[in-house]
Amino acid sequence: MNTPAHSSNSPSHDPGESHSRAIAWAQTMHGFDSEGIRFAHADSWAGAGSTNIIDRVEREAREHELLAPLATRSFGAGNRVIAEEEDTFRTCFERDRDRILHASAFRRLAGKTQVFVFPQDHQRTRLTHALEVAQVATAVARALGLNVALTEAIALGHDCGHGPGGHASEDALSPFIPEGFDHAVWGANVTLVSLNLCAETLDGIRNHSWSRPAPQTPEGEVVS
């Protein structure tokens, strides 16, 4: 069982400090500047092929054209408990995916064996399981024309808050929680709450277990 993803006692993040570090790091590169791009190597030759930046607004418009009729569009989504300014480049679901990927709750999954250990096999943890689920789910979502970023966010976050030792931990922890312990509900409502994720992402995480109501998005259905 995980505590919230970030402690309130953790030091505040200074964007200016990160920018300064990025500039200092770029100056250690042996490359050169060309059309506003810093190349890492002195003999770099391959750029992006274009200096045109595809921002979030244009990418959301492409989603509207390319995704399947019932797929979840990023435009108009992004309903968070605490309202936030939209990112210039990333969609709301890409931001969710990134937050989960960098969260301490996600990294702690590495210390939890999924079920039990086979001495002759590699250990499978909740972290490796989440990565495998994300790989399969995004492949399916891409083939079906669904929102891949939302699918990946749900898949990566679906076991955050899970107890150790498989689902037996739910039985062990349930007596201590009035409504009983369900790792999916606990993950969405407690462990990941500090990340301020979108409602669609939390719904997919909360309802990925078959004992729960069906998710409200096709992306959530793919993960479950």
Functional labels for PLM-detected ranges:
Residues 1-36, 47, 51-53:
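N-terminal secretory targeting signals
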Residues 20, 25-40, 58-84, 103-107, ...:
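Sequence-structural signature of the catalytic-core scaffold of metal-dependent phosphohydrolases
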Residues 82-88, 92-102, 106-128, 212:
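Active-site flanking loop/helix segments enriched in acidic
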Residues 92, 132, 186:
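Charged catalytic carboxylate motif
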Residues 94-95, 144-157, 200-205, 223-224:
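Alpha-helical scaffolds flanking conserved acidic
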Residues 103-119, 144-150, 155-170:
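A short glycine/small-residue-enriched secondary-structure motif
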Residues 119-150:
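Alpha-helical phosphate/pyrophosphate-handling elements in metalloenzyme active cores
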Residues 129, 158, 183:
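Histidine-centered divalent metal-coordination motifs
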